[in-house]
Amino acid sequence: MSEIIPEEYKRTVKSALNMLAYADCTANQLEKKLTAKGYSQESIEFAVNYALQRGYLNEKRYLERFIEQLANTKLYGLNRIALEIYKKGFSLALVRDNLGEFVKDIDFEENCIKLAQKNKRSDRNKLYEYLIRAGHTGAHAAKAVKIVLSQADDDEI
């Protein structure tokens, strides 16, 4: 039993699947992209639901990979990760239910130290502020600054 799908719905679904083939995105982002292409709201909702039901659009998987990428590649702290998640448009319920699980294995203190070593600055305050802007806690940033600057002092001797 196949359902009859109007032609506009087919075009919208095809466009959505093409977008998802190139890059993962949230349902919110997909809706915005399809709206920008001029599709009707009804066909956009159909396409998003189609992609969700068939597993082409999996926000939980995307959220997990996005968090891992920000923590492991950019060495962001939890606060900056939360900001980036908000900017991407993930649903609040999804984030609330899964954030703790996805970040439990990430060593933010170690990431903070790595980021401080990667971006050595001679000024203690500038380095500390840089780490805070990267989303690390004050305690982690202070410890990283202390370690990196003590290593720099040891190198000079």
Q: What feature does the model see in each segment?
A:
Residues 1-157:
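An alpha-helical, amphipathic repeat domain used for nucleic-acid recognition
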